[in-house]
Swiss-Prot record:
Segments carrying motif Cx2C motif 1: 243-246
Phylogenetic classification of the source organism: Eukaryota, Metazoa, Cnidaria, Anthozoa, Hexacorallia
Residues the entry annotates as binding [2Fe-2S] cluster: C208, C218, C221, C223
Major place of residence: cytoplasm
Residues that hold [4Fe-4S] cluster according to the record: C243, C246, C254, C257
Residue interval(s) of motif Cx2C motif 2: 254-257
GO biological process, one term: iron-sulfur cluster assembly
Organism, scientific name: Nematostella vectensis (Starlet sea anemone)
SUPFAM superfamilies listed in its UniProt record: S-adenosyl-L-methionine-dependent methyltransferases
Localization, UniProt: Cytoplasm; Mitochondrion intermembrane space
A Pfam short name: CIAPIN1
Annotated region described as Linker, given as residue ranges: 152-196
Protein name in UniProt: Anamorsin homolog
Amino acid sequence: MEAVVDTNNFVLLLWSGAQLPKDIEAVVGSLTKKVGPNGKVSLEHSDRLHIASHAMSSFDVVLSGVCESPSLIHSMELLSKLAKLLKPDGKLILREPVGSNDSRSPEKIISTLKLSGFVSISQANEVKPSIVEISAQKPSFEVGAKTALSLSFAPKPAQPKAETSAAQIWTLSAQDIDDEDVDLLDSDTLLDEDDLKKPDPLSLKAACGPGSGKKKACKNCTCGLAEQENGDATEKKSVTSSCGSCYLGDAFRCSTCPYLGMPAFKPGEKIALTDRQLKGDL
């Protein structure tokens, strides 16, 4: 176990369960001797790790469950916490009991380590029956580290021109135009006189009967159907009086009357209102 620890290393020893004090003291003593006076060995229980005041990226090596009779189950939450405590390129050595079923197998532990951000994961030889030892390493970068991308904003070189033979296929020379053997279409002959006639709006209406519907104007309508639809919409906006006294003048009009402010007019006389007058005041 001391082989993974170097001089001047900061080591975190994580334990859990009912460990014997002499077993913990033996491991701490051997590690303290290995790291030397400039190193440090910190002892922490797994249940109190979340309230400990350890700084992030402060340990070179984390030894978890390496004492006698390990019982610590390394969840993803615990492994993610250990990854934050390790320095970049820091090492993690863990031991965990495994059962005969697939609920806690070495493959499951390795998968959890990968999801927690560890790399260079390897399984050591069997320490004891039903106990597995796995080593892993934190990547060489910190969590949330930033790096500059080598982006070039220099002008890009011009694209190579198309082959001359390919360009000549789509071009005509002056000699080709004067050549009598070349048939050129006259654009004035593409449309007949019937094509230039404006259609009758009545012919655009759909036939009556079951399943027949009204034709709608196209987006770029040029046949006059759009103007006809707009005219129908304008006629639908005709305003009717609910009191029948609007034509007498403002003295007989409501506060929201669209004719308010206009002079009196004859009953049945057509009065044109603007869009602003058709909208009531809020």
